Amino acid sequence: MRFILVVNPQSGKKQSAEILQRIQPMFESRGHDVSVIETAYAGHARELAAQLEFTDYDGFLALGGDGTFHEVVNGMMEREDPKRLPIGLIPGGSGNSFLHDLDLVDPINAAKAIIEGRTRPVDVVRTEMPDLVLHSINLIGWGLVTDVGKRAEGMRWLGPSRYTIASIIEIFLKKSRRATLVVDGEPFLREFTFIIACNSLHVGKGMKMAPKAKLDDGLIDILVVDGGITRRRLLSVLPKLFDGTHIHEPEVIYYQASGFSLSPDRDEPINIDGEMIGTTPLS
């Protein structure tokens, strides 16, 4: 079999080269041909997935983090021709929250799954914003979760722990926001602390944000935290994100829906698959 392998050398702790040295012989020993392309700039993986010639290839692989995977999926969805290849993901980032759902956070195990031809369907969430359409495989966040994502981006030197530390900081800086949320046609106008819509169960580094989520059920799991929740209560809820019991708290509302839209009182940035891309309103 022949594969294209896109490698992001900047992912996580910049261990992609080391991981590549470990996994490439695994493919070669099974007689598979791997064409390795190293990304040179942000958005490069997306361009490659959208524009490369796929003739005679059997799979499109990506070695990187959630941001790299997001780029590959969006590039694949943007192709002008109807060609689609199975996408194989090999973790090389610091979060790799999507691969937690597949129990493939170890790059060797992920490579083995690809070599063994293990495939499965995964939902893709189409997200429409002003002058921009993107596709999500992991999460769409607004409010506090976006604040956390922005802060964590500037704390990459802390590794995976940056998500927890950024969360604690932003909880102390907490502010509520007013918005209209429409879930499967039913509108809710109120104050929110944050809204996060998940395709996957995990976000960040192993947080079970949406414990009922399945990657292929055709539903979006939407978690809403009321704007009136206190900082003390938020801090007490934070540890529960790691076992999924936070959804039983009175300030938390959990929906499973086929679609939703969000219109805040003012336009604000959106967190899509861990990347700060686009602004509200969205649907």
Question: At which residue positions do the language-model features occur?
Answer:
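ATP/NTP phosphate-donor binding region
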Residues: 1-60, 109
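Catalytic core of DAGKc-family lipid kinases
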Residues: 30, 39, 54, 78-193
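Short glycine/serine/threonine-rich phosphate/pyrophosphate-binding segments
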Residues: 45, 67-72, 97, 122
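Short Gly/Thr/Asp-enriched flexible loops that form oxyanion-binding sites at enzyme active sites
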Residues: 68-82
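Glycine-rich phosphate/pyrophosphate-binding beta-alpha loops
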Residues: 141, 196-210, 276
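Gly/Ser/Thr-rich active-site loops/lids in small-molecule metabolic enzymes
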Residues: 156-162, 206, 211-232
